[in-house]
Each structure stands twice: as structure tokens, then as C-alpha cells.
Amino acid sequence: MFVSIRDDVVLHGGFSSVVKGLRDLGIDAVEVRVRRDLTVLSLVNPSQLHDLSSPEGLKALETELAQNGVRISAFLLGNDFGRDDAEEQVEWMVKTVKVAHQLGINAVRVDAIVSGWESIGVDGAIRLFAENIKQVLEATDDTDVQLGIENHGTLGNRPEFLQAVFEAVSSPRLGLTLDTGNFYWFGHPLSRVYEIMRQFAPKVKHTHVKNIAYPPEMREQQRPIGYEYGRYVCPI
């Protein structure tokens, strides 16, 4: 286990580049967001993107990593299988997993977002998500890259959704990107958050660590989703 940080979070913190932020923070690993066009942020120049679909872009990223003693802990994907372009998203995700394999990156964070899931219900969202993520796994079965669904949003923080997807897909390569703050953000009482974490611990492939400092009298209450997050969020 080792500590890394999101590329976007480093820049949000005011650092002039990802590499500069990593050095100041004493961290040598970064989680990198891959955009829909297969570009990623340069680690040394935030105004520059590297195209991972081209040999030149891939080489440029590898050079930055080697020259600065940095490794990529995971790729991050912002997929949404509720959109009309799910087929194109699967292709993008497959390409990303294959690049991850080529670079020796062991994990890819995938999103639990399914826009409009309310109109098809949780069961419909489970079927839709499972169908698409199965395609990604099957198309990359010659790799050992692990996919971690982040417990994110109004759907992904429902344990019944996550459990049903894992059972429907039944792949050892599919698990959880455990966000330690999101189950709490969703409104689960603190003791329930710990129960959920224990339940899914064997499925964890990757983690996002953050905290919310609700006052003691609110910690065991079932709260509305996202209740006063801006007030109580507590950066670690």
C-alpha cells in the first residue's frame, strides 16, 4: 500500500504543476484522469495534454514519469452508462485499460454514475451497468488490470447496487474504489458506514481517502444526501 494523490487535486491546491506539488508534499505517486479523447494532463506543464492513443504521447508521459521519479497509481475514468453513447464509452474504457496494462498500472477507477437511473430503477441501473462493464472486462481479459467502481453519487453509495453489480458480473478483476467519505456523504450513519466498509473490504482495489466532520449529535443520524457538505467537509 502507498499514498498517492489525484492530478487535478494537486493543481486545485495551487501548485504550478503536478510534479511540483508531489515534491512539496513528499509523494511519488499520482492518480491520473484520462479524458474521453484519451488525453492526460502533463505532469510538468498543466497547459499541455498527452495523447495516449499515439506513440508520441505515450512516450512523452513515460519520459515525464522517469525523469521525475513518479509513478501512476491508477487511471481515473468518468464514465456514465446512462448516456446515449455507452458503446463509445466502452471502447474508450477498453483502450484505457490496455494502456494501463502497457504502462504497468494495476488499477483503473470507474464511476458508478448512471444518469437518469431513477426512470429505470435500481434494478434497471444494475443491469445496464453490469452489461457495459462486462464488455470492458471481456475485451481486456488478456490483462491483469483491476477495475474499481467508486462508491460515488446517489446510486453508487447504495450497498445493494454495488453488491448486485459484483454478483452479476462475477469477475475477480472487478471490485471497489473505496471512497471513505462518500458513504457518509450519502447520509449513512457512521456505524453503518463502518459496516459497509467491512462488507466490501475484500473487494477493494483502490481507495480515495477523505473525511467529513459532522458533530457528534449528527453522526448516527440518517441525514439527507450531501447534507451541508461544504460546511462539514474536513480535508485530511
Show the residue positions of the predicted features.
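A short, Lys/Arg-enriched amphipathic alpha-helix followed by its capping loop at the start of a domain
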Residues: 3, 21-27
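Short coil/turn segments at secondary-structure junctions
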Residues: 45, 80, 84, 116-121, ...
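The substrate-binding groove and active-site-proximal loops of carbohydrate-active enzymes
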Residues: 9, 46-52, 78-87, 233-236
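Active-site acidic/histidine proton-transfer and metal-coordination neighborhood
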Residues: 16-17, 21-23, 58-74, 81-176, ...
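Glycine-rich, proline-tolerant flexible connector loops at the mouths of alpha/beta enzymes
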Residues: 31-60, 113-118
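Flexible, active-site-proximal loop/turn residues at the rims of small-molecule/cofactor binding pockets
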Residues: 36, 81, 114, 190, ...
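Acidic/histidine-rich catalytic cores of soluble enzymes
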Residues: 2, 7, 13, 30, ...
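Residues that line or immediately flank small-molecule/substrate-binding pockets and catalytic motifs
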Residues: 34, 79, 112, 204, ...
